[in-house]
Amino acid sequence: VNLGSSVGITKVNTENELDDAIRLGISFSDTILVEKAICNLREINCSVLGDGDECEASVCEEPFMNDEILSYEDKYLGGGKSGGASKGMASLGRKIPADLPKEKSEEIRKLSCDIFKAIGASGVVRIDFLLDVDTDKVYANEINTIPGSLAFYLWDASGIKYTDLIDRLVEIAFRRQRNRDNLT
């Protein structure tokens, strides 16, 4: 539950597999979550930049999965093929922008901003969603409050260059600190 990056995540089909998955999960954390699987899914990710109620969402992306779920190996070991470390999510194969109908993309971008505001986020976050292909329903899967690589590849595709992203993050940090200073 608390490690992120799909550490300890297992999809199971039988009770024996569930027992093994639980043993694996508790080897990483004393809290685990067992939930119904989405069998026909696409992962769609979106980044949000801002502070509090002022925010904007990037274009959406669809990372490529080697299996039914986007695993730790997919994210950080190049699909497990090379066995070596990679540059994390930034080096993962992906489709930017995600191949989605405009309405679905806008729904995910709006939901991303709503989640950003609901948790009182500041700076840049990346929110990972699961899209049930059979029902067209979107599920928020993970909120990355300090996304690896700052999700710069999503902002670059949204027209914000890396240096401009860093400048905006610094501006947000200074503004937040000024607001805190004014409270005392």
Where are these regions (language model features)?
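A short alpha-helix capping/helix-coil boundary motif
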Residues: 1-2, 64, 90-93, 129-132
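Conserved beta-strand and immediately adjacent loop positions that scaffold enzyme active sites
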Residues: 8, 45, 128
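Active-site/binding-pocket entry motifs
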Residues: 2-3, 66, 78, 175
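ATP-dependent carboxylate activation and anion-phosphoryl transfer catalytic cores
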Residues: 41, 99-184
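Phosphate/diphosphate-binding glycine-rich loops and adjacent basic-rich segments that engage nucleotide
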Residues: 1-13, 21
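Phosphate-binding site of ATP-dependent enzymes
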Residues: 13-88, 92-95, 99, 103, ...
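A short, terminal or domain-edge coil/loop segment
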Residues: 3-4, 85-98, 174-184
